[in-house]
Amino acid sequence: MKKKWWHDKVAYQIYPKSFLDTNGDGIGDLGGIISKLDYLKELGIDIIWLSPIYKSPFVDQGYDISDYYAIAEEFGTMEQFEELLAEAKKRDMYIIMDLVINHCSDQHEWFQKALADPEGEYADYFYFRKGKNGNPPSNYRSYFGGSCWEPVPGTDLYYLHMFAKEQPDLNWENPVVRKKLYEMVNWWLEKGLAGFRIDAIINIKKDLTFSDLDPDGPDGLANCWRMVENVDGVGIFLEDLKKHTFQKYDAFTVGEVFNMKEGELADFIGENGHFSTIFDFSAHILSEGEHGWYDAPPVDFKEWRKAISDSQLRVQTCGLEANIIENHDEPRGVSRFLPDYAQNPAGTKMLGTVSILLRGIPFIYQGQEIGMQNAVWNSVEEYNDINTIDQYHTARNAGLTDKEALKACSKLSRDNARTPVPVSYTHLRAHETPEHL
C-alpha cells in the first residue's frame, strides 16, 4: 500500500450546534471552533470533521441542505469559515466537511422548481412516480419510519425520500444532477477543504422498478434498504464521483457504508478504492433490534471484542478503516459498550485506548475525550432527533408503555451525542482527566 498523507492522522468530529457558542444565542458556531483549535492541536488532533454547516431548515439537524454553497447563519459566515481554514492550516491541521448528496432539503431551489412543474426539467432531478390505485408507488418504509413516498398535492404523483419527507432523494441516474454535484464538491475543495465524510452514499443507486417487497413489519411496509442492497452499479457512480472530484485534489474521503457485500472491501478502500477509508461499524450493529430500538439487545462485551478483532483481520490486506466508538448518529460509547460495573474511569480509558491503538485512522467524537455518557431524558418532547421520535412511537405501537419506550430511546438516541460539550473541560490536555471521571 502506498503511503498517503492521512495514514498517520487522528481525526476529531465536531457537531457544531453543541460544541461551543460564542455569541450567546445558544447554538455552537464557527467562532467557537476557531477558538478551540489550540486545544484540539494539543489533544493530538490532525483532521477536524465538521457535521453539516450548510444552509438548512434543520429538520434533520443539517442533513437536509437547502443551499450547498452557503453557510447556515446559525453557525456564522463564509468569511468565518475561510478564517477557520486559514487558522487550521497555520497549525498543520486539516478541515473536512460532511457531504450529503443522496438527498437534499425540500426547500432547495431544485426541488421547489420540481414541485412547481412535476413534468419539467427539474422533476428529473428527483424520483417522481405515479401512485397505484390511490396508494404510494411501492410499499417501502423510510429509515425514519412511514412510507418512502410523499404525495404531491393536486396530482397523482409521489416523490421518493429514503429519510424524512423533507429530504427528497436526488436522482443520480441523471447526468445533469451528477455534474452539478461534482461542480459543488470541487468548489469546496478549491477553497482549501481537505476532503469529505460522505453521508449515506450507498443509497444513491436504486432499484428503478420500485417493485413491492414482502412486508417486514406490522405496518405492512418493507425497509427501504432492501431497494438498494442487491442492485449493481453503485461502484460506477462512486468511481465517477472520485474521478471528477476527490482524485484531482488528493482529498481525504471517509465513506458511510453499511452492509457491504462479501469481497467488496477492496473496492471501497483498496489501493484504487472509491474512498480513502470507511467507518468500521461492525461493533455498532450488535445493538440493532429486529424491529427497532425497543427490542435491541444489550451489547455483550465479548461479542464487541470479537467484532473488532474480526474487522481488523478482514481489512489487513486491503487498506485502512476509520475506527470509531461514537459519532453524531450513535449514543455515547461508554453507555453503549461498557457494562454497568465498567462505567468508571478505568473502563472509560480502556475504551478510548482500544480505539486509538487499533490499526487504522482513529476518529474521536467531541466529548469522547472527557468520557461523556448518555443524557437523561424525561419525556419524548425533550428530544430533537426526528429518528428518536419515530422510534418512540414505534415502541408504543408495539405495546410498550411510555416509560418502557423512553427507556429504549434513552439507550440509543442520536441526541445522546448531540448534547452540549461542557466548556469547562475543553482546556484539558490529552494526559489530564476531569475530576468527575
What are these regions (language model features)?
Residues M1-L437:
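Active-site and adjacent substrate-binding regions of carbohydrate-active enzymes
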